[in-house]
Amino acid sequence: MIIPVRCFSCGRVIASDYGRYIKRVNEIKAEGRDPSPEEIEKIFDDLGIERYCCRRMIVSHVDLISEIMPFS
């Protein structure tokens, strides 16, 4: 669905970082491969997302809006 605006655990604003995270991951996927855990960690470090709770919010988010829209 839609990414939560704030981290559920610490309250840090994460919605603004989600788009940049997805853009960087898609750049890696455009090369024909999945990002490695080290690359994901570097993306988070570059974005300034240090807490594991915030990282969890972004990594575990599943965007289902495109799958749900045909049923509305």
Swiss-Prot record:
Give the UniProt entry's GO cellular component terms: cytoplasm; DNA-directed RNA polymerase complex
Q: How is the cofactor bound?
A: Binds 1 zinc ion.
- Give the catalysed reaction(s), semicolon-separated: RNA(n) + a ribonucleoside 5'-triphosphate = RNA(n+1) + diphosphate
Sites where the protein binds Zn(2+) = C7, C10, C53, C54
Keywords attached to this Swiss-Prot or TrEMBL record, sorted alphabetically, are: Cytoplasm, DNA-directed RNA polymerase, Metal-binding, Nucleotidyltransferase, Transcription, Transferase, Zinc
Record localization? Cytoplasm
Q: Does the keyword Metal-binding apply?
A: yes
The record's InterPro entries line, in alphabetical order, gives: RNA_pol_su_RPB10, RNA_pol_suN_Zn-BS, RPABC5/Rpb10
| Cofactors demanded by this protein | Zn(2+)
Q: Which GO terms describe its biological process?
A: DNA-templated transcription
- Asked if Membrane is a keyword of the record, the answer is no
| EC numbers on record | 2.7.7.6
State the superkingdom.
Answer: Archaea
User: One MF term from GO for this chain?
Assistant: DNA-directed RNA polymerase activity
Pfam families in the record, alphabetically?
RNA_pol_N (PF01194)
NCBIfam families, alphabetized: PRK04016.1
HAMAP family xrefs: RNApol_arch_Rpo10
How does it associate, per the subunit comment?
Part of the RNA polymerase complex.
Q: What does this protein do?
A: DNA-dependent RNA polymerase (RNAP) catalyzes the transcription of DNA into RNA using the four ribonucleoside triphosphates as substrates.
The UniProt similarity line reads:
Belongs to the archaeal Rpo10/eukaryotic RPB10 RNA polymerase subunit family.
Its protein name is DNA-directed RNA polymerase subunit Rpo10
